[in-house]
Amino acid sequence: MMQNYNYKYYEPLEQMIAVRHQYMSKIIKKITNLNIYEYLKNKKILDIGCGTGEFLKNYHDLNNQCLGIDIQHNFKFKNKIGFTLKNTDFKNFIKNNKKKFDIIFIFEFLEHLSFSDREFLFKNLFKLLNRNSLIFISTLNKNMISKFLAIDVAEKYLKLLPKNTHDDKYFLKPSEIQNLANNNKLHLIDVSGMTYNPLFKSFKLSKIDLVNYFISLRN
């Protein structure tokens, strides 16, 4: 079960569960003409930076084989057949991994990586993928508005996250992810923004990608 940590700091991430699912549904429908429940059957799914494992667990319940990795050991669930959460660094995982996946989640993770770690990840993503696989990413845009809302408001004023969770020098513009993808045999499907409503503690898809946004890729 979970080890000791302040659960409130995972709440903003778990408030994203519905909008992540909504975004994935939109993309899967766009490229396969299937709904997400038809498509997500017997798939092999990797969640890089899986947090508590809450989001990934939903897709194991749809009869997929799910593996989540995170450098922190704050998992909510015990491992069982078809569902594994590993406390490991993503570099070590990639170096030792022999499996391939149909879907990879990289949610709220890239903005915590150095530039060299980011390049390492993208250089190796292609090796992790089966044919016709999908990658779903969410992260923070790089601009003054994003810095103000994600750091000054969320961390310092509202205290939704611990101070120093983010460093805006690691925030990424969508074009930066697209360049990393293009340089590593991956192709852009879509970029969509999402906005947060603090009154309802919920996110929704938006045409505005100034702060949070999704990107989907394929090989």
Annotate each PLM feature.
Residues F136-L158:
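Conserved class I S-adenosyl-L-methionine
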Residues K159-E176:
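Acceptor-substrate binding/catalytic loop of class I
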